[in-house]
Amino acid sequence: MKTYLAVDIGASSGRHILGWLEDGKLKLKEIYRFKNGAEDQNGHLYWDIDRLESEVIDGIAACETAPESVAVDTWAVDYVLLGKNGERICPAVAYRDSRTETVPDELEKTVPFAWLYGRTGIQMQKFNTVYQLAAQKKEMPDVFEKAEKLLMIPDYLAYRLSGVAVNEYTNASTTAMVSAEHKTWDKEIIARVDLPEKIFGELHKPGEALGGLTERVKEKVGFDLTVRLAASHDTASAFLAVSAKDENAVFLSSGTWSLIGVELKTPVTNDESRAQNFTNEGGYEYRYRYLKNIMGLWMLQNMRHELGDENSFDKLTELAQSAADYKGRVDVNAECFLAPKNMCAAVKNELMKQGFKEPTVPEMLSCVYHSLAESYAETIKALEKLTGKIYTSLNIVGGGSRDEYLNKLTAKACKLPVYAGPTEGTAIGNLIVQMIADGELASVQQARDVIRDSFEIKIYEP
């Protein structure tokens, strides 16, 4: 029996999941899990990339027998730079770091956002890689004189496993430096930001084999296997796991971020799309993920932590339901919720600014739950206007698909049936790319049929 290993790393945790086909169904087994999180050092937020590498290797070693292949997916936009000997020459700064605070405005003269969006189709986020690189150029100009290669975080981890350093297309597309039309690095953007062109390597497709493990890694894990490229932006993998039956489905990858959108064959880069801040991220088989980033479970994760981690998410739901009639709402995409010192205080402040009296904890939680559901509904309306299509269902994958209360509120707000599951959407998407590349599955459509037959999909009617 052939098995495949997905390494799926999010902003708060990572997991290694084995997958295999058995009697026409996809089976999963989690074999390793670890915590992740950005760390504050000397005024900047960093990922402990060396620890992540160790965790990835330890998780591979936890396999009882060698899988056919392994692939790594992570969040988008963050990167490292390599020197001439393949060594990392800068830390992995986290996207929530404040170094890009003023960069979009500073670059507006040379890299106007309207022009940038027209070329890349990538939404305005101050932490987009193009702005991170501009911030680093300003803060550490010398590093670019030594830099030979830029690698996104999953590309770097795959490089540390295989010794082969390449740029994978789906994650590269989130940098706001890849041409939406040509699907290659945009040399004009690179020149305007005054970056060395040589650090941007040829873009490679998900599923490509990089080769076996390096001798160093092989020695640690006790066997060899093929290292493949995943659709290495976790959302690109998650969208693959949506078991929608037709083209009229909206996809929602629900985790720390909520990414809600549709698959399109061509990008939408017009002025209205730009004004609504929709993004066109590269997907598997060059299908565009036309979507919007919404703050997602990040707000609830932080509130839980502040209220005491002993409170389960079920407890938060219970508290929120006890104040279900509370009328206060916040813009879940407001800047103040991106990286506040205290999320509860940030929510409280926003509500009191609107004239509400100081909210209780249940009222704050109710506010966030309802605000999230209503933001999904607003996004679907905008999608219909921008694409000229009517959508008939919302399909949720990822950890948030387990949140029954949020799913019920979402179905009601969107006036659409909600199909929730599978939970491990990103890992499943990672696995099916490997299986298609190895010939175990014939196509994405066959994979989605298998997913529908393999996992419980809960339905919430409006």
Q: Which role fits each region the language model picked out?
A:
Residues 5-6, 101, 108-120, 131-152, ...:
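Active-site core segments that coordinate phosphate-bearing ligands/cofactors
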Residues 1-90, 118, 146, 218-228, ...:
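N-terminal glycine/serine-rich phosphate-binding loop of ATP-dependent small-molecule kinases
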Residues 67-75, 149, 202, 386-399:
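Short glycine-rich phosphate-binding loop at a beta-alpha junction
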Residues 61-95, 123-129, 158-179, 202-205:
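Short beta-strand-loop/turn "lid" adjacent to the catalytic site in phosphate-handling enzymes
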